Regions:
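Non-catalytic helical/linker scaffolds that mediate oligomerization, partner binding
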Residues: 1-127
């Protein structure tokens, strides 16, 4: 089945949804995989542009609001840690945790940033 992700803020339906992240569209190429809702839904990009991705559904399902999108085949121009992640990391270290699990690691700098913020108070696990 065909499915579109785009920047159009209109409510989604069975044929398309809004993905409000132009940086993802800018980095996509045909053949890239998109994993939605922790990989429960899988899409393959057939065609794309600066504001859309036309995809083939390889594993279907229902997409509800604010589900995560992972692009495992593409290095995205995004920081590994959001402002909230940095705050949460500091709080976790203050609690005395032993390990921090860093998701969606794309570059060595992502781990370096987390390690610098942890300042030796916790080990980093890349996943």
């Amino acid at each position: 089945a065909a499915f579109r992700m785009d920047l159009d803020p209109a409510p989604g339906d069975a044929t398309r949804v809004n993905l409000p992240h132009p940086e993802i569209f800018a980095a996509l190429e045909p053949g890239a995989s998109l994993l939605v809702n922790d990989g429960k839904i899988r899409l393959r990009v057939d065609a794309c542009g600066p504001d859309f991705a036309d995809c083939a559904v390889t594993v279907g399902g229902v997409i509800s609001n604010r589900k995560g999108v992972n692009v495992p085949d593409v290095v995205l121009p995004l920081a590994a840690l959001s402002k909230k992640d940095r705050t949460d990391l500091e709080f976790a270290c203050e609690l005395g945790i032993d390990w921090l699990a860093l998701s969606f690691v794309q570059r060595p700098e992502d781990v370096t940033e987390a390690r610098d913020l942890a300042r030796g108070r916790a080990a980093i696990l890349s996943k």
